[in-house]
UniProtKB/Swiss-Prot annotation:
Lineage: Bacteria, Bacillati, Actinomycetota, Actinomycetes, Mycobacteriales
Keywords linked to the UniProt accession: Cytoplasm, Elongation factor, Protein biosynthesis
Principal location listed in the UniProt entry: cytoplasm
Protein's gene: efp
Protein name: Elongation factor P
GO biological process, one term: peptide biosynthetic process
PANTHER family to which the protein is assigned, alphabetical: ELONGATION FACTOR P (PTHR30053), ELONGATION FACTOR P (EF-P) FAMILY PROTEIN (PTHR30053:SF12)
General function of this protein: Involved in peptide bond synthesis. Stimulates efficient translation and peptide-bond synthesis on native or reconstituted 70S ribosomes in vitro. Probably functions indirectly by altering the affinity of the ribosome for aminoacyl-tRNA, thus increasing their reactivity as acceptors for peptidyl transferase.
Family recorded in the similarity comment: Belongs to the elongation factor P family.
Source organism of the structure: Corynebacterium efficiens (strain DSM 44549 / YS-314 / AJ 12310 / JCM 11189 / NBRC 100395)
Amino acid sequence: MASTADFKNGLVLKVDGKLQQIVEFQHVKPGKGPAFVRTKLKDVVTGKTVDKTWNAGVKVETATVDRRDMTYLYNDGSSYILMDDKTFEQFELPLDAFGDAGRFLLENMRVQVSFHDGEALFGELPVSVDLRVEHTDPGLQGDRSTGGTKPATLETGAEIQVPLFIETGNVLKVDTRDGSYLSRVNN
């Protein structure tokens, strides 16, 4: 059991018999009336998000979730194949297990997978990854109609917006949470 004061992003709760992960939360103390907590919860099985409001101080049942370090091996077209780094056991995860961040997965990348009662729930990539630019058009110095960015295709096939000075072959640091360009990595 946890109180609403213990809420943090990533915490997994049991709500109405379903496992739901806190994506966002906000403590609200209105001028009149009791304090409450607004949350955005994501169902770990279906991926659907719902908004839920809790009175401050309410006890909520939490789910025991273990996180294991794993290595991403490959995508067989219908699922991701991962290997536990300690036991070398292989696991299958559905293609939506990493959410939108799955487009940044590279073979042999280390990831974390969350388990509940022995069942794999979802995976998480590191906050940032280094990826090589496979293709991007040359940036023209005078071309500012696009706000100083251009599309670039990364080695995983993902397309992101990058500054005009980025060239094909550059290695970039990319934020896996929102797919944004962070910096160019020195080779």
